[in-house]
Amino acid sequence: VEEAARHLGSGVCAVDLAGAEALYPTEQYADLFAYAKQLRIPVTIHAGEAAGTESIRAAVAMGAARIGHGIRAAYDAETMELLKEHHITLELCPTSNLNTKVVDSIEQYPIRQLMDAGVAVTINTDNMTVSDTCIQHEYQLLADAFAFGDTQIKEFLYHAAEASFTTEDIKQRLKARITYTF
């Protein structure tokens, strides 16, 4: 965290906790994230994939601005409301979630529940090499399964711009580019 603080704004934009959340529960890192918060370093935390909604609530309590995966929030109305209230964006990774058996099929992927609840979601690859995917494939997978078109893709991209760990000026320029493209 101290190293991240030294380089914040010079190639470092946040602190991330990623990995096997079932083996290394999010709660074990509370002191680390409290320290990051004290140093004003934004935080993203891997939660709600292998572990349940309790890991998502812990990530929120620890100050996460974004949550890697968080897919299990879709099965709990209170957790979705918590994410919405705190303006926390979920970094969804459909192919990875299929590979790890979080869902049995893309048709069962609960992205619509999250969107309908007003939770901000982005589309991501997780580990491109392990999952043998790319961002274009992730978007196409969802477009095919849920009939998503430009409107939904634009929404995902807007959420990504808004949740990015950068200045408001850059966020606005990203959004303008998205608007121009769509």
Where are each of the predicted segments found?
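Flexible, acidic glycine-rich loops studded with aromatic residues
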Residues: S105-I153, H159-A160
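Short, electropositive alpha-helical surface patch
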Residues: V1-R6, Q140-A147, I178-F182
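Glycine-rich phosphate-binding active-site loops on the catalytic face of alpha/beta enzymes
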Residues: R66-D76, T129, T167
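Histidine/acidic residue-rich metal-binding segments in metalloenzymes
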Residues: V1-A14, L23-I45, E49-G63, A74-I88, ...
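Mid-to-C-terminal alpha-helical segments outside catalytic/metal-binding sites
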Residues: A147-F182
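Divalent metal-coordination and catalytic microenvironments
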Residues: V15, H46, I67, L90, ...
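Glycine/threonine-rich flexible loop motifs
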Residues: T100-K101
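Active-site beta-loop-alpha junctions enriched in small/polar residues
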Residues: L17-A22, G48-A50, G70-R72, C93-N97, ...
